[in-house]
Amino acid sequence: MLKQRFFYFCLFILMSYFVTAQELRCNISVSSQKIQGTNRELFTNMQRDMYEFLNNKRWSENIFQYDERIECSIQITLDEQIGSDQFRGSMQVRVSRPVYNSSYSTVLLNFRDNDIDYIYREFEPLEYSETGQNSNLVNLLAFYANIILGIDYDSFSLMGGNDFFNRAETIVARCQNAKESGWKSFENRRNRYWLINNLQDRSYASVRECIYKYHRLGLDVMSDNLTDGRLAILEALGLLQKAHRIKPNSYLMQVFFDAKADEIVHIFKPAFTDERKRIFNIVSEVNPANSSKYNALIQEKTN
């Protein structure tokens, strides 16, 4: 009887660990329609292995309850298969977080990576080592796991994502000799190297400050005080002008507005005219690519 009670106690502790240990609730999809003549079960197993790697691994020392896990998705579109086990394509990474005291979920990151190139061998486990060598697939998934965590933590506390961004930067540094693209500065200005470079660059610290103030002091306040929350978002976006005027046309700025342009218009469209003009002047300066969307902010309201 005593042994049985001890067994159930150990089982309870073990189950509690697995319920609370993992940080991500990441939906994975692998689209392989462009690849012909391949065993489709291979891609089912590939998707399952990626899902288990991201969702079952513990990425930090922090404890998450089941309903606190970070909502995210990774959509992989494979364009070609080289040989039996090498694949190339693109990846869309999307991260969202709940807004306090509401049913609304806000997008933190909506990022497209066009430099996806990895080897996947069926039935070979995906294992990550912080000190040893990893496959490019494992490095890709670990890099984005840390980016996802870092962005989420930044939205709840000022510079809260530092540890995760440091780990992502370490992964990039270790991949400088990789034959696969996306890791190096000279390949193009919009890849993994420049994403983490911008996040770690002190010149863009005001962008990360904006992420915190926009979400924690702005969106999270709006259910209790709409005016104060909207004003905090206005002031947060004003910080982006500081970064833009120091180093214009940054990749990080584009990544921010890819996630936020539509939401900003939705938040400020009901505001008073002077407030709408202020926000229009900010966002049209720092994000001219979405100027057609922002024009809705200065259109006169009709009854």
Residue ranges and their predicted role:
Residues 1-24:
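Bacterial Sec-dependent N-terminal signal peptides
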Residues 160-253:
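Flexible, glycine-rich surface segments
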Residues 33-40, 127-135, 245-246:
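Second-shell loop/turn segments in exported
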